[in-house]
């Protein structure tokens, strides 16, 4: 009987999701300046824009690149580099360019040819997460279903993978006992990589160390303060020796690599009432960070007083798995997860007065809800070169590159502005 009920619930949910998606699609011309939807051959659990841009002469677009991965059923997995053509500001943009058949608009007839897979490198198992090294973006670290962290220099691999499926990383980083997701390169110390694991530990490697036989590098330090699965780890963006970690023990920990005690963080705080899945340091404000949790909230923290949670962002209907500050705006951050929504928040609007109708849609700091995904969002990335452009990937193979309409984040023009809550959500 329970099976029947579950099947009925699933069918109802699917219908609701489809209805919401239809509403979203109908409203996209008013809500977005850009929407590109691309179905990948396999779902990607990871997404990160590379920092370089090519601007071909005489064209109305620029070429950006993304690091992606695959999560196949039983076939060969790959680390993937894709290119994306984004229209320049002077490209033709208006709602009349909307193509309802293809579900995209904005100076583009179709996405075909605008998003291309450039490089595929054989990978052992699915790519849980892939992140490039800031000092040399050709170097990419990946988290695998095994305990190894792999490092690839993609310039040393053919763009078409060896059909044998052999995975040939340039380094294998050892130290974990289990798989995981968290991965962070030190922006201030070249080659220093942190990784979080289901084995309750955080490993630190220096990839400039001389590898042992088989291109293996052992962890330089293993941090053992958490008592459960460590979900995410992130270096501080200014202080080369500080990093943060979050775990299923509901804690946020701040560590200092200069300390000799690798089992005790410099700060530990009970951050949420459920597992903490992600964290992000603010790129403009050295004391501010955010954490996202299975308790459906994003929490805002100040390193100078971690006893006090600055704010709790509430609107998600389910677990949050990714949170990222905007690289261009100090007060903007985004979060995503199981509820198929990517929410963009604006700290500067916290506490603003709202009409009762607006309050029904969410708190004043909820700037935008991206409702284009019909499955759990696995990862997303803010484009470092084009403000307000985000790439998000979901479990149903869909990758979307999108930018909310300018009148939503530019308050200057109250005339003709669109209510940002028209999303199907």
Curated annotation (Swiss-Prot):
<dbReference type="GO" id="GO:0006355">
    <property type="term" value="P:regulation of DNA-templated transcription"/>
</dbReference>
<protein>
    <recommendedName>
        <fullName>Histone-binding protein RBBP4</fullName>
    </recommendedName>
</protein>
<dbReference type="GO" id="GO:0008285">
    <property type="term" value="P:negative regulation of cell population proliferation"/>
</dbReference>
<dbReference type="InterPro" id="IPR019775">
    <property type="entry name" value="WD40_repeat_CS"/>
</dbReference>
<keyword id="KW-0131">Cell cycle</keyword>
<dbReference type="GO" id="GO:0000785">
    <property type="term" value="C:chromatin"/>
</dbReference>
<dbReference type="GO" id="GO:0045892">
    <property type="term" value="P:negative regulation of DNA-templated transcription"/>
</dbReference>
<dbReference type="GO" id="GO:0030512">
    <property type="term" value="P:negative regulation of transforming growth factor beta receptor signaling pathway"/>
</dbReference>
<dbReference type="GO" id="GO:0016581">
    <property type="term" value="C:NuRD complex"/>
</dbReference>
<feature type="modified residue" description="Phosphoserine">
    <location>
        <position position="355"/>
    </location>
</feature>
<dbReference type="GO" id="GO:0000781">
    <property type="term" value="C:chromosome, telomeric region"/>
</dbReference>
<dbReference type="GO" id="GO:0006335">
    <property type="term" value="P:DNA replication-dependent chromatin assembly"/>
</dbReference>
<keyword id="KW-0235">DNA replication</keyword>
<dbReference type="GO" id="GO:0005634">
    <property type="term" value="C:nucleus"/>
</dbReference>
<keyword id="KW-0779">Telomere</keyword>
<dbReference type="GO" id="GO:0007420">
    <property type="term" value="P:brain development"/>
</dbReference>
<dbReference type="GO" id="GO:1902455">
    <property type="term" value="P:negative regulation of stem cell population maintenance"/>
</dbReference>
<dbReference type="GO" id="GO:0005654">
    <property type="term" value="C:nucleoplasm"/>
</dbReference>
<feature type="cross-link" description="Glycyl lysine isopeptide (Lys-Gly) (interchain with G-Cter in ubiquitin); alternate">
    <location>
        <position position="4"/>
    </location>
</feature>
<keyword id="KW-0804">Transcription</keyword>
<comment type="similarity">
    <text>Belongs to the WD repeat RBAP46/RBAP48/MSI1 family.</text>
</comment>
<keyword id="KW-0832">Ubl conjugation</keyword>
<dbReference type="Pfam" id="PF00400">
    <property type="entry name" value="WD40"/>
</dbReference>
<dbReference type="GO" id="GO:1902459">
    <property type="term" value="P:positive regulation of stem cell population maintenance"/>
</dbReference>
<dbReference type="InterPro" id="IPR015943">
    <property type="entry name" value="WD40/YVTN_repeat-like_dom_sf"/>
</dbReference>
<dbReference type="InterPro" id="IPR022052">
    <property type="entry name" value="Histone-bd_RBBP4-like_N"/>
</dbReference>
<keyword id="KW-0597">Phosphoprotein</keyword>
<dbReference type="InterPro" id="IPR020472">
    <property type="entry name" value="G-protein_beta_WD-40_rep"/>
</dbReference>
<keyword id="KW-0158">Chromosome</keyword>
<dbReference type="GO" id="GO:0016589">
    <property type="term" value="C:NURF complex"/>
</dbReference>
<feature type="cross-link" description="Glycyl lysine isopeptide (Lys-Gly) (interchain with G-Cter in SUMO2); alternate">
    <location>
        <position position="4"/>
    </location>
</feature>
<keyword id="KW-0007">Acetylation</keyword>
<dbReference type="GO" id="GO:0006334">
    <property type="term" value="P:nucleosome assembly"/>
</dbReference>
<feature type="repeat" description="WD 3">
    <location>
        <begin position="176"/>
        <end position="223"/>
    </location>
</feature>
<dbReference type="GO" id="GO:0042826">
    <property type="term" value="F:histone deacetylase binding"/>
</dbReference>
<keyword id="KW-0853">WD repeat</keyword>
<dbReference type="GO" id="GO:0033186">
    <property type="term" value="C:CAF-1 complex"/>
</dbReference>
<keyword id="KW-1017">Isopeptide bond</keyword>
<dbReference type="GO" id="GO:0000978">
    <property type="term" value="F:RNA polymerase II cis-regulatory region sequence-specific DNA binding"/>
</dbReference>
<dbReference type="GO" id="GO:0045893">
    <property type="term" value="P:positive regulation of DNA-templated transcription"/>
</dbReference>
<feature type="repeat" description="WD 2">
    <location>
        <begin position="126"/>
        <end position="175"/>
    </location>
</feature>
<feature type="modified residue" description="Phosphoserine">
    <location>
        <position position="110"/>
    </location>
</feature>
